[in-house]
Amino acid sequence: MPTVNQLIRKPRTAPVKRNKVPALQANPQKRGVCTRVYTTTPKKPNSALRKVAKVRLTNGFEVIGYIPGEGHNLQEHSVVMIRGGRVKDLPGVRYHIIRGVLDTQGVKNRKQRRSKYGAKRPK
């Protein structure tokens, strides 16, 4: 416990908050164009081919976005919407591509958690 004199000499400093999604620039989502769509492998101990896309945003940032769900229709020059949210086992992937918005189609035959994957209600 510091004394009053110690606090006068060197006041308490608040910890510096680091922005986890700098490319969004305090916006909830950003639009961008896919420059490369590819698969990558996760860190140990996981094993898969995760679908990701490199996206050039409208503000000039170039980020890597994860494509959630089974199957996708994205290719180079597809216009996509990006939201924050990292993928824990993919280093450098700090954004998610939103399904069912702009050029990204929703997941086919999705029955549960449809809103997360842009799927319409089945008849």
From Swiss-Prot:
Family label: Belongs to the universal ribosomal protein uS12 family.
The keyword rRNA-binding is assigned to this record: yes
Source organism of this protein record: Brucella melitensis biotype 1 (strain ATCC 23456 / CCUG 17765 / NCTC 10094 / 16M)
Protein name as catalogued: Small ribosomal subunit protein uS12
Subunit structure: Part of the 30S ribosomal subunit. Contacts proteins S8 and S17. May interact with IF1 in the 30S initiation complex.
Keyword rRNA-binding: yes
Cited function: With S4 and S5 plays an important role in translational accuracy. Interacts with and stabilizes bases of the 16S rRNA that are involved in tRNA selection in the A site and with the mRNA backbone. Located at the interface of the 30S and 50S subunits, it traverses the body of the 30S subunit contacting proteins on the other side and probably holding the rRNA structure together. The combined cluster of proteins S8, S12 and S17 appears to hold together the shoulder and platform of the 30S subunit.
One GO MF term: structural constituent of ribosome
Modified residues (3-methylthioaspartic acid): 89
Gene Ontology terms: cellular component: small ribosomal subunit
NCBIfam families: rpsL_bact
InterPro entries found in the cross-reference section: NA-bd_OB-fold (IPR012340), Ribosomal_uS12 (IPR006032), Ribosomal_uS12_bac (IPR005679)
Keywords: Methylation, Ribonucleoprotein, Ribosomal protein, RNA-binding, rRNA-binding, tRNA-binding
Species lineage: Bacteria, Pseudomonadati, Pseudomonadota, Alphaproteobacteria, Hyphomicrobiales
GO terms of biological process kind: translation
